[in-house]
Amino acid sequence: MYKEKYFEELKKEFNSEDEIVTEIVNLEAILNLPKGTEYFISDIHGEYDGLNHILKTGAGIIREKINDCFPEMNETEKNELNFTVAYPKYALEKRQLEQDAEELTQWYFGMITRMIGLTQFCASKYSRSKVRKSLPPKYAYIIEELLYVEGSPKNKQKYYEQIISKIIELDRAQDLIQSLAGTIQKMVIDHIHIVGDVFDRGRKSNQVLELLEHAHSLDFQWGNHDVLWLGGYAGSQACIATLFRIATRYGYIYDLEREYGINLRALFTFATQHYQANPAFYPKAGDFDQNNLDLLSQVHQALTIIQFKLEGQVIKRQPEFQMDDRLFLDEVQQGKIQLGDQEYPLENGCFQMVDADHPYELTKEEQEVIDSLSYSFRHSPKIKVHVNFILEKGSMYLIYNNNLLYHGCIPLTEDGDFDQFEYHGQKYAGKDLLTFFERHIRAGAAKKTSDEDDDTDLMWYCWIGKKSPLFGRTAMTTFERYFIADSATHKEGDNPYFKLRDRLSTAHYILRKFGLDERNSYIINGHTPVKVSEGESPIKGGGQIIVIDGGLSKAYQKSTGIAGYTLINNSYGFQIVTHMPFQGIDDLYESQTQSTSLKRIIDRDLPRRNIADTTIGTELKRQVDDLKYLLETDEISH
């Protein structure tokens, strides 16, 4: 019945057999075009400026295209074209200041000519229909004329030159250059994979999401920081307290108030009444005067204690999480704490709101604070839009073009088998474990009430739990970092996965269990910064696990030595991209240098991949089969 209805609906899209034949020819032709370029990036962490720069430059792809398209140009000319494509408005403003009218006219003519040539070069792997869709409507006709005149007989050269000259004469050169730049930026990246962690640490998560919402093709693999926000939206007060504590720690809590309309009044009033300024709780980032440093340290302490109380409540009502070793508030009144066989003194104490008899119970005022934050967060229109976007485009893992993408890890035992997580009498491991968590994340986010339940508790566990595929460590040592001086207690032990992923056998085991060809598939993994300064490589698993961490978070750039790795997969294979820290447009313009370097990482010769070999190709083949069936079995009425 469903199939019959499907074909009835399909018939309505066509008025004749000729239209079906045309569509079949079109789809089968598309299958033979080279596959589009995929771009993989992870761990953006609210760093809008760095991400925006990467996308504007195509992660170095645009410069490579310029090298291939214009081998005769010198490095200065290539750098100028590359910068103008990435930052056309800035480049145009600089030119206007530096050149007179005649020089500017010549520059416009040369730049438009080069940008048309580059656009044509980038468009050569796409159908005309797809190219047309990427053009700005107001200049679509003009750009198409210029694109398809290039390389034609000499008698059209004057026609070509006249179009450009007339655009300059009519004072539309700047507008056209900006339109061409946007078109090139769209063409060099066909699809974006965000391999987790858009939120936290950086202050511009909202701008990151708004930028990504305009991407023409994109997917997410959720990270633990993303699920923290999803959990907060679903009603987990432990998630709410944590994400606001992190915002205070990294100095962007005021940004949440401004951008998302969060009401902070109850929180700030409570914090100033019950906590004293404490330099140990000053924000790690941001430019604040002394009054604000002191105020934020009070807020930071209040949120920290509320978080530990709420986490304790989750741990106590979910014994299957096996996290009793993270219950510390029972002991804090003694001024020391027992970890394993050793006792440690506590420093920076701020436990005055902890009741020795009921350490995990919120006071009435604390409950009012967290209720206010939760209500404000869950009813923010912008947060609703961003959460729904991440849910719609996201998942715990993705199989795309025969590659496996996930953020954190696949929990393993020391022997290399899938580790099991037991919940309500059922055991989950490997692919089933990721599916289990995704089901509860979607259920938690879909419910209309703010009540905490198993779904919201499991979302919190995804953020912090020992067997969470998004976290992958034995413990999150937040308490130890705040209150114990001995740095040995701050270490977070890794799941065996992170050691075993160096082995080819581990890559093959995981790929096989996810139903993929272990010889020709790859794992793309985010979450952990690659410490280049210590000699670490992003290529693991015998070359079949590629670890990317966008490295955009400034908090990690000192330890990694770079601004991270991202990944490109075009029709020829994979290229890994090394990024240096982005210092701003002014610095880039003055230096006229590249902030990225690309390196092909598969040494063996591989056949060039067409769309027919991709996930999209599989869908197009299905459409062709359906149309052929329709053509053979039904007469289309006029």
Swiss-Prot record:
A GO molecular function held by the record: fructose 1,6-bisphosphate 1-phosphatase activity
Top EC category: hydrolase
Keywords noted in UniProt: Carbohydrate metabolism, Hydrolase, Manganese
Cofactor needs: Mn(2+)
Pathway the protein contributes to: Carbohydrate biosynthesis; gluconeogenesis
HAMAP family: FBPase_class3 (MF_01854)
Name of the protein described by the UniProt record: Fructose-1,6-bisphosphatase class 3
